Amino acid sequence: VSAEISSTMDIYATAHDIAGIDLPNDRELDSINLMPILTGGKGDRETYFYYRGYRLMAIRHGSWKMHFMTQNAYGQPQPVTHEVPLLFNLDVDPSESQNLAEKHPEIIEKLTAIAKEHADSAEPAPSQLETRIMAN
């Protein structure tokens, strides 16, 4: 078990490393190499952004996870936008059951600034959920 931040998209960079293949450098990649984590070391990711389609739903930074919006599942009622984001310390509350937003406004402020910086620099890609490839 590891508390390091990782994602299934990291399999891409990890597989390249295992195979001895260089990653493409003609585009920005979100994948990171997990080999340091898999061999008992620290990971390279400190922050992770949770999207649903084009919507930034949440951000994780270190032990903290903050939800701007929540939604149960695709096809369910529209997401709930939280005027004050929900905040959880995943080190002590991995089930995200104790909202700490009122106790830690400084963390809300810090993560909001990180999310804004990310949003200002991110270039949206076409949605794979809204685009269908027609069979020939």
Predicted features along the sequence, with ranges:
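Intrinsically disordered, low-complexity polar regions and short flexible loop motifs
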Residues: 93
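C-terminal cap/loop subdomain of S1 sulfatases and analogous C-terminal strand-loop tails that border
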Residues: 1-86, 90, 121, 125
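Cytochrome P450 catalytic domain signature, combining two hallmark sequence patches
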Residues: 44, 108-109
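A general alpha-helix detector
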Residues: 14, 96-99
